Amino acid sequence: MGSRAAGSVLLRHLCPRVSSSTSAAAHAHAQRPPLAGAGGGGVALWARLLSTSAAAAKEETAASKENTGSTAAAKAEATKAAKEGPASATASPVASSYWGIEASKLASKDGVEWKWSCFRPWETYSPDTTIDLKKHHEPKVLLDKVAYWTVKALRVPTDIFFQRRYGCRAMMLETVAAVPGMVGGMLLHLRSLRRFEHSGGWIRALLEEAENERMHLMTFMEVAKPRWYERALVLAVQGVFFNAYFLGYLLSPKLAHRVVGYLEEEAIHSYTEYLKDIEAGKIENVPAPPIAIDYWRLPAGATLKDVVVVVRADEAHHRDVNHFASDVHFQGMDLKDIPAPLDYH
């Protein structure tokens, strides 16, 4: 009985509040304006939406026209600059790039602006042309004999193909001779990284050798203009020789360096024959290319004969370095144990 009395009292208090809430909701519904599609209020609201969309469309059209105009102006300026060509570029050179890298302005010893980007004034030198050209490593052990006769076998097809066209022969020789230094330097570099040890300067020495041989090629490209089939031959020979020397150096560095030593001996012989034909008048002694004059610090009136003399001296130095490197390995030592002959020209 007590719970029933309490329930009846609670109902008497709640009923008036529920009825008042319901009437308030009905009154609010009656006062709310109709939505779209429900009379004049909907039409007005739809008109406002249409006017807003139209304004936005006009703004987008104006912005699009403005962007199109600016793009057209930029294209016109670029076309004008392209038509003006080098003169415009010379008049307003780019001082620095986005990355802050500025083109260095160098000059030679006589104050003339340096025109070569492939080498710098401090990388030029005067080779020692008094070096002994007749040095020869006599093959005694098996590996030496393998290296010696491998090089001799490679000379046979070269003699047949080029005969006495020593300009093209030198070009082909330098495309091959520039490979060993790069391969050896690369493998020593990777070994230094793996073992956390220095190379004794041999990485730099071998890479300098590769760069020097490449400069020989750049020089003889100015002297002998290769034909299309000679360029194709260079592609084939370089591809085969690079992979063969790479595998050979992995298997036996002492054999690889000995092969290069004998290869340089053959290069000395080829350049000696080249000089004989120049002196005999069989090959015209043309003026030396400008790149050769600056690279080897030759006199202004230098000729092709002077170029061949300094290139032959370079090959003799490379012969000594590679035979020396092979001797180091034959004595059971690593190249890092013996200081490299840096700047040995």
Swiss-Prot record:
Protein's UniProt name: Ubiquinol oxidase 1c, mitochondrial
Task performed by this protein: Catalyzes the cyanide-resistant oxidation of ubiquinol and the reduction of molecular oxygen to water, but does not translocate protons and consequently is not linked to oxidative phosphorylation. May increase respiration when the cytochrome respiratory pathway is restricted, or in response to low temperatures.
A single GO molecular function term of this UniProt record: metal ion binding
Short name of any one Pfam family annotated for the protein: AOX
Residues annotated as binding Fe cation 2: 213, 264, 315, 318
Annotated positions binding Fe cation 1: 174, 213, 216, 315
Induction notes from the record: Is not induced either by drought, cold and salt stresses, or heat shock.
Gene Ontology biological process terms in this record: alternative respiration
InterPro entries named among the record's database cross-references: AOX, AOX_sf
The family this protein is said to belong to: Belongs to the alternative oxidase family.
PANTHER family: ALTERNATIVE OXIDASE, UBIQUINOL OXIDASE 1C, MITOCHONDRIAL
GO cellular component term of the entry, any: mitochondrial inner membrane
Protein origin, superkingdom: Eukaryota
Cofactor binding note from Swiss-Prot or TrEMBL: Binds 2 iron ions per subunit.
Transmembrane segments: 170-190, 232-252
Subunit note: Homodimer; disulfide-linked.
Tissue: Expressed in leaves and panicles.
Keyword Transferase applies: no
Alphabetical keyword list: Disulfide bond, Electron transport, Iron, Membrane, Metal-binding, Mitochondrion, Mitochondrion inner membrane, Oxidoreductase, Respiratory chain, Transit peptide, Transmembrane, Transmembrane helix, Transport
Subcellular location: Mitochondrion inner membrane
Keyword Metal-binding carried by entry: yes
Region annotation Disordered: where it falls in the sequence: 60-91
Enzyme Commission designation: 1.10.3.11
Catalytic activity: 2 a ubiquinol + O2 = 2 a ubiquinone + 2 H2O
